[in-house]
């Protein structure tokens, strides 16, 4: 995806060097150092699409004649059929494709590059391919959200311990826990959709950076390529890669969401609170009893790759002057690597949770550890009229007095402490049955029926909201894909007029 000053095409019969650049610098070790041809396989199809749209526009504007346009478009079809591996040597895929066209058509093949620099060509190809990757990642995330919603439906009554600082905090449910990540993935979806809007802009027609004297139609190439709009300023359009930063940032944020989920599952697995399916675990080479959550550990580890990609991209772009610098050749790979890695992580993380076994009895017992129902007892006293801070003091004293094998105080212990602090019997505020219910993790969860809480009715409402959000995002995704597909159909229809 390199670029530089464009050159006139020399004699097409000279095959010793790439057709496009043979009139200038000789070959040597630096030539291979400059080349990104191998890496550019990812944007091979994108370049062909960009070339076709550009040639159709040139012919429509009578910048090149119809016969030449037809010859070039036919040559591009041959190049596509031959594939990336058959391209001649070149600094990048763009130069190699142009050389392959000139080899087939002759010097007139060089007219394909009229009114264009590789600067705007490269930018268009990156945007074209990146939007496809974004949509694929969004589809994967949407699928993961659907899996998590199904887990929430199935486990809405499965009580589990909730933690802060990795210490037992309050009882919750598997459904409530899993929906917390589904909601985070909703926001990750939104960030990717937002990035798509700024990626899907057409830089073609900007040329090197100062536009072109030819009467090009930038809106036409935008329509043929499925771009929603034109990137307005020609210098910015050719030079900027901030859309890569925005996309990679969204991907790194998504990876961070996944790392939290992965860490939760790793910790829960270590306590016997979840049993991963064998497909998402491995054993030790020496300790046959082990069932290790390796896949989740790798999801956690790959987050570092995504963050490193973002840092690498920002470092690459830092301090680059307008308008083009070869540093940019290294920019795209940071985004591609992050996207590929995190897309796999989404699939693995969601699959691990969806296929896991959640042992209800074990989890309910664990939900009593460390007097995790303490907040519920304090809330019960507060609802009976005791100032919350006073209620907090009563329960804190009870927690401090627990023995090493005790998970929660009984009614008598709480009653004695309450009388010491309040100056009157506990029964003045709450009866025994209500207090014992508050000490029970299942009842404690049922009490927490505020919007967004873990109580079954509150979870059911969250599931409903999540399903609606999922449907809305699926619709947006389908619309984006349809727009791209329709543009491809329009482009092929126009190409067929010439070939």
UniProtKB/Swiss-Prot annotation:
It is found in: Cytoplasm. Residues 1-22 are annotated as: Disordered. Keywords: Amino-acid biosynthesis, Arginine biosynthesis, Cytoplasm, Lyase. Signal peptide: none annotated. Pathway: Amino-acid biosynthesis; L-arginine biosynthesis; L-arginine from L-ornithine and carbamoyl phosphate: step 3/3. NCBIfam families: argH. Transmembrane segments: none annotated. It catalyses: 2-(N(omega)-L-arginino)succinate = fumarate + L-arginine. Its EC number is 4.3.2.1. GO terms for biological process: arginine biosynthetic process via ornithine; L-arginine biosynthetic process. One of its GO terms (molecular function) is argininosuccinate lyase activity. It is an enzyme of class 4 (lyase). SUPFAM superfamilies: L-aspartase-like (SSF48557). Residues 7-22 have a biased composition (Basic and acidic residues). This is Argininosuccinate lyase. GO terms for cellular component: cytosol. It comes from Haloarcula marismortui (strain ATCC 43049 / DSM 3752 / JCM 8966 / VKM B-1809). It comes from the Archaea. Its main location: cytoplasm. Belongs to the lyase 1 family. Argininosuccinate lyase subfamily. Pfam families: ASL_C2 (PF14698), Lyase_1 (PF00206).
């Amino acid at each position: 995806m390199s670029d530089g000053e464009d050159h006139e095409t020399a004699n097409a019969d000279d095959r010793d060097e790439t057709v496009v650049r043979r009139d200038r610098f000789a070959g040597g070790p630096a030539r291979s150092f400059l080349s990104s041809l191998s890496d550019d396989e990812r944007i091979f199809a994108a370049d062909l699409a960009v070339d076709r749209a550009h040639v159709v526009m040139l012919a429509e504007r009578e910048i090149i004649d119809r016969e030449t346009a037809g010859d070039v478009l036919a040559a591009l079809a041959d190049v596509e059929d031959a594939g990336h591996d058959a391209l001649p040597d070149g600094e990048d895929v763009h130069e190699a494709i142009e050389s392959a066209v000139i080899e087939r058509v002759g010097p007139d093949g060089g007219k394909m590059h009229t009114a264009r620099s590789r600067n705007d060509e490269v930018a268009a190809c990156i945007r074209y391919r990146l939007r496809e990757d974004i949509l694929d990642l969004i589809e994967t995330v949407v699928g993961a959200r659907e899996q998590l919603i199904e887990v929430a439906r199935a486990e809405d009554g499965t009580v589990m311990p909730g933690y802060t600082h990795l210490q037992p905090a309050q009882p919750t449910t598997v459904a409530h826990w899993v929906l917390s990540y589904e909601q985070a993935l909703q926001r990750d979806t939104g960030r990717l959709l937002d990035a798509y809007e700024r990626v899907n802009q057409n830089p073609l027609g900007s040329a090197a950076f100062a536009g072109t004297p030819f009467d090009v139609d930038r809106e036409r190439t935008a329509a043929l390529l499925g771009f929603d709009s034109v990137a307005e300023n020609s210098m910015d359009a050719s030079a900027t890669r901030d859309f890569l930063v925005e996309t990679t940032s969204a991907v790194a944020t998504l990876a961070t969401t996944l790392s939290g989920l992965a860490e939760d599952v790793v910790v829960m697995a270590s306590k016997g609170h979840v049993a991963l399916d064998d497909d998402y675990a491995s054993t030790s080479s020496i300790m046959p009893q082990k069932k290790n959550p390796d896949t989740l550990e790798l999801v956690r580890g790959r987050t570092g790759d995504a963050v490193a990609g973002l840092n690498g991209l920002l470092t690459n772009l830092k301090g680059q002057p307008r308008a083009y610098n070869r540093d940019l050749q290294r920019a795209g790979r940071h985004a591609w690597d992050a996207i590929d890695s995190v897309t796999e992580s989404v699939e693995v993380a969601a699959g691990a949770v969806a296929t896991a076994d959640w042992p209800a009895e074990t989890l309910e017992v664990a939900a009593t550890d460390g007097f995790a129902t303490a907040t519920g007892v304090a809330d019960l006293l507060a609802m009976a009229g005791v100032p919350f801070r006073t209620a907090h003091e009563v329960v804190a004293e009870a927690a401090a007095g627990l023995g090493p094998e005790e998970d929660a105080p009984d009614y008598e212990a709480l009653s004695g402490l309450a009388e010491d602090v309040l100056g009157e019997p506990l029964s003045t505020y709450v009866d025994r049955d209500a207090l014992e219910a508050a000490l029970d993790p299942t009842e404690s969860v049922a009490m927490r029926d505020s919007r967004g809480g873990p109580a079954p009715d509150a979870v059911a409402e969250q599931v409903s909201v999540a399903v609606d959000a999922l449907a809305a995002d699926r619709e947006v995704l389908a619309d984006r894909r349809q727009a791209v597909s329709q543009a491809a159909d329009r482009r092929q229809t126009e190409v067929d007029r010439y070939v």
